[in-house]
């Protein structure tokens, strides 16, 4: 499982710029339809062959100029809880501020590695000014300039060295599929597992955030063994009262990255909200299987909303990845819970599916012949061979004479045709066009 790196610090010190540089992206991707900033605070990075996940703790905060120390404190607490290494960003131009002191005081108490990163150091004078940050009591510091990228190589070298050595998974952990039960606070995650197991495996109350730790439960249904995880990743501490997507998303990262299939539980009485969208996107981005369970359906007035209408509303928010099973359940009455588990097992099997190269070519090349990629600048794209790659998640490559002319719309067309002929429901798939 990847290490998780959290970037913390007060507003306007360059956290997001460093974040974007680490994941090699110029700007956040905003979904204008839903209003959700989908790719704002979480990304993947790699340095010297080591992959890791990066979280920008400021990524979901609006109006950051007005954030009080208390908000920053909550972000730092969250980073301490959920990350393996913390990067604390400060600004050499402003020097040490009272808020920097407050954050440093918290970080001095933790046992996890903390890298003090002094931003905007782009000349010899500022290198001298940076010496002041020794006074924060965090030891060695690393100078860099997030806009130009100067110094980030040394910071990344130190980051890789700071990663803890993690034990290799046991044979049973490798063999058994892992299903993560995810969702925003109080959607009914623990109740769902309790209903399946038939005993109070988890402490459940009406107060959001009562699941104290991630708990793996080995389970056997339909002769199929797997691990169920009710993640502490989607619980908030009592003192974190704000209903922000950020807290749910950050607490979801570890469980989702480690899962094969994510069971996303949403509260029928509240609808498919921002937190749900963010958690769904997180699972999709990590190429995990997804099953959506609409819990507490027994509490919804059926005269005002049918399952068909409700499902249609959810699928609108899932675009373009809509080939996902959606089931209406009640953990309280145990309505359709076994159906939900059967659907999860099916998604896992879909994710493991392998298509022979001969069958794949036989089916897809006929479709491509009848519906070839659009010509561009008078040049015609020809695809003569395709195959599924030997990867853990479904990935397909099509070999073309002019791969650069194949646009995303045609890739979606190919994906839809694959889904029409083979069952990949609940599973993200990747399409690559390569030069033959």
UniProtKB/Swiss-Prot annotation:
GTP 1 binds at residues 9-16, 56-60, 119-122. Keywords: GTP-binding, Nucleotide-binding, Repeat, Ribosome biogenesis. Residues 3-167, 177-352 form the EngA-type G domain. The keyword Transmembrane does not apply. GO terms for molecular function: GTP binding; ribosome binding. GTP 2 binds at residues 183-190, 230-234, 295-298. The keyword Nucleotide-binding applies. GO terms for biological process: ribosome biogenesis. Residues 353-436 form the KH-like domain. Transmembrane segments: none annotated. GTPase that plays an essential role in the late steps of ribosome biogenesis. Belongs to the TRAFAC class TrmE-Era-EngA-EngB-Septin-like GTPase superfamily. EngA (Der) GTPase family. Associates with the 50S ribosomal subunit. This is GTPase Der. The gene is der.
